[in-house]
């Protein structure tokens, strides 16, 4: 925390964001959501897309600020357009669930694809859901299995659960209850 503070005092945006994460989550210091938001805001204003995404999440869930889902989407979009994979995934999820915007599965799948192209695990998994159920693109269960497998191999637990279900009921693969149980345990 001390070194992040020293670097943040020198206006280093990444350090401001990391110090904000320390305050938000109580890493090495007492939690202080207001300080976290102030640091994210300062780093965002300095043009640091990951901080812009973190600030968006604060607005989405009300960490240190009033919930403002529309503002969250605006911040996610700004960071997503700067190629921030986490923001692309979060923006896709907003479209997927209609959070701060009208639900739009096609937009969701497009943003998930952009983040998945950067190997962002959650986006790979969510893109798999889009393919499995035909949300926003043509249904392709084989592609869904490939994406779930990739996300699982990258260490994303929900992908193991979805893959386990595919093996349990035979969605896109032969039924294999032993493999299903193994995947559920890994999840």
Enumerate the predicted regions with their spans.
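Low-complexity/repetitive intrinsically disordered segments
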Residues: 1-10, 15, 38, 42-45, ...
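Hydrophobic face of amphipathic alpha-helices that form TPR/SEL1-like repeat modules
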Residues: 18-25, 54-61, 75, 90-97, ...
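Short helix-capping/linker turns of helical repeat alpha-solenoids
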Residues: 10-13, 25-27, 32, 45-49, ...
């Amino acid at each position: 925390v001390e070194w992040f503070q020293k670097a943040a005092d020198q206006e280093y945006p990444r350090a401001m964001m990391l110090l904000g994460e320390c305050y938000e989550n109580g890493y090495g210091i007492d939690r202080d959501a207001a300080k976290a938001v102030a640091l994210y805001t300062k780093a965002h204003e300095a043009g640091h897309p990951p901080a812009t995404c973190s600030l968006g999440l604060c607005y989405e869930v009300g960490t240190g600020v009033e919930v403002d889902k529309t503002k969250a989407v605006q911040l996610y979009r700004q960071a997503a357009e700067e190629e921030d994979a986490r923001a692309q995934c979060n923006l896709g999820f907003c479209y997927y669930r209609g959070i701060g915007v009208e639900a739009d599965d096609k937009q969701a799948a497009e943003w998930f694809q952009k983040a998945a192209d950067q190997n962002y695990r959650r986006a790979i998994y969510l893109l798999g859901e889009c393919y499995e159920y035909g949300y926003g693109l043509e249904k392709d269960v084989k592609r869904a299995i490939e994406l779930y497998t990739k996300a699982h191999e990258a260490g994303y637990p929900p992908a193991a659960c979805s893959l386990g279900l595919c093996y349990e009921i035979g969605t896109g693969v032969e039924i294999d209850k032993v493999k299903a149980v193994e995947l559920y345990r890994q999840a």
